[in-house]
Amino acid sequence: MKGAEPLAELRLRATFLERPNRFVARVRLEDGREVPVHVASSGRMKELLVPGAPVIVTLQGDASAQPTRPFGGRKTAGRLLMVRTGSTWVSVDTSLPGKLFHQAVVAGSCAPFAGYTEVRPEYRYGGSRIDFLLTAPDLPPCLVEVKSVTSVLPDADGARVARFPDAPTARGARHLDELAGAVREGYRAAVCFITQRDDAQAFGPWDEIDPFFGETLRKVARAGVEIRAFVTHVTPEGAVLGGELPVRLAR
């Protein structure tokens, strides 16, 4: 899959200090200033956001001055975009997976969805807004939910497995049930787990964190919902959607 998505117009390297709440992180810029930045992901990311971790942030306005303008409804200086763990850069921008998926489908470079010519984001179906509706004259309409994945853990066999969710998500399970209902009505439906890093070898639900989501994922897979996963190649300069990952649903 081709097409890079720039992560920000102005990117600055910094050091992660702390996360006082789910949506704010404090970082130290290279010039020594400590500033709060918005964290778009409400996931815990405890294995990523550790004091001293290198990060990439984007600031509002003039980065040479102390920024004070509000961002995301909070007094934050900008956004946290990426964190490095070991030698791997991980995007924590939750809007990025949807952008990359959208671009890939439009470009015809996302093989599982080749042939779809129209992409409608935020499609209302049932009681939910589904991320995408894909349509084409000779193909069944396809509803797609895109999930952002940042955690990768070793499995029992040593394989590095991307895991979702890293916090309980009743909303995520509800979306899965909506997709299963769509299959019963003649739609094609899929959930795509976009791993925002390139060191995963497979994907599987994180049952220890949210067993209900894991069981729901297995249930909808049996009902005909496609479970797909992809890696993302991330560098400080941008990100490219990569190939598919094997999916491990067995407990």
From Swiss-Prot:
Query: Which Pfam families does this one have?
Result: SfsA (PF03749), SfsA_N (PF17746)
Q: Which Gene3D superfamilies match?
A: 2.40.50.580, 3.40.1350.60
Signal sequence extent:
none
- Which InterPro entries does the entry link to? SfsA, SfsA_C, SfsA_N
- Domain of life of the source: Bacteria
- GO function term, MF aspect, one: DNA binding
The similarity comment for this entry is: Belongs to the SfsA family.
Extract the HAMAP family matched here. SfsA
This one is known as Sugar fermentation stimulation protein homolog
Instruction: Tell me the gene name.
Output: sfsA
